């Protein structure tokens, strides 16, 4: 993963200095070098448990549940869940001019630039390499075609899982999100009960309520307002639908329509991924 992060950083730096044409050449060259390095390390560091490396990406609109399902799968498969949203929030919590610039972007519902995301991700991959992590599940990256091309050039993504949910349910979920200011736990106070589309089954998503010790400490993220959420959804569709097409054309995209809440959706997602629920182990019930 150190090779991946170095190549990502090199590609980002090249993109800020040169034209798109020259950047593409440097991306390809860096990708070839990184691919060779990853291949060598892969032969030496095969996963002992089942011999398989997991290098997956989760796509989906803000609030769809990428973090929830990616986290459960990371526990089940014992690979790190790397959420770029968490990387951004950690950076926001660090004092200084960079966090102030980042806060202005996020609070206005804009997507963070490629360069910022790539640098944050690169740092996280380097830290993981130092700890001996094998594989990863990415959540929130890539969000643009350029990011997808950089990632494609430096590592093999096995699978891209595109979670889909009706927009009115997405809006309700985003507005219902809460976080415990003490433990950092994520919860949702929204209770969603909607008629099915085109005669389909009714959609019910119960709230994910906090334990008693967290109830008085719940806070709302500053970017979870109706105006900002709608803007984020619009920006997502403009930028990320081409990313879906990018992976669909390569035969790597699995589109999964969430039928309801976690109890209903989780076993069906495992079935779609050909994973045995009996191997779930530490994943939440």
From Swiss-Prot:
Compartment annotation: Plastid, Chloroplast
UniProt-listed CDD domains: ADK
Keyword terms: ATP-binding, Chloroplast, Kinase, Nucleotide-binding, Plastid, Transferase, Transit peptide
Region of interest (LID), residue spans: 176-224
Organism: Oryza sativa subsp. japonica
Organism ancestry: Eukaryota, Viridiplantae, Streptophyta, Embryophyta, Tracheophyta
EC numbers on record: 2.7.4.3
UniProt keyword Ribosomal protein present: no
TM region(s), chain numbering: none
Family: Belongs to the adenylate kinase family.
GO cellular component: chloroplast; cytoplasm; mitochondrion
Catalytic activity: AMP + ATP = 2 ADP
Protein name from the UniProt record: Probable adenylate kinase 6, chloroplastic
